[in-house]
């Protein structure tokens, strides 16, 4: 949004962003064994993992239904220049390979530096690792904004969040239960609040458009949260 104001489609506002809010709430309840079930520790167990995967299947069905109906109307300014299929496949494979290996090197290097400074693994995961694994989304969304394809920019972020919570965490927890460790309810609440902020900004402000000042506000909120995590160390 700082690069180029992002207009949010009606379907995104009424269905997809609420899905992100729902995914955050589902994760909050799945990860709160101590508060809700009087358990000994907060853990995302196998049953929780299956619940998350069930929501992922619902999300897939919704996505396929949209695809069959042709999706939202695309304005002239959002049309993407056609590219030969072979070239598209080549770009996808090459880009994925670069992102996978580059992201792995970034995360390993950043984690090594953080551990040498005595920073906890939960803070590493919430800041450096999260930032490193989000670089592909950042690059994709910024590029889409520069090419005036706001639907791709915001859809990339929403889809990534839903995929990570429902599928990645769902698969991981189903294979092996995931203790929450140093991640507490404040972190989960911040995640829910960020999704609500995106919905409120898009719905109540200027013509369902996330403007540059609002983009700056979101960045300031993230910097403040990161500073809080570091200060707690």
Where do the PLM segments sit?
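Hydrophobic alpha-helical segments, chiefly the membrane-spanning helices
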Residues: 1-233
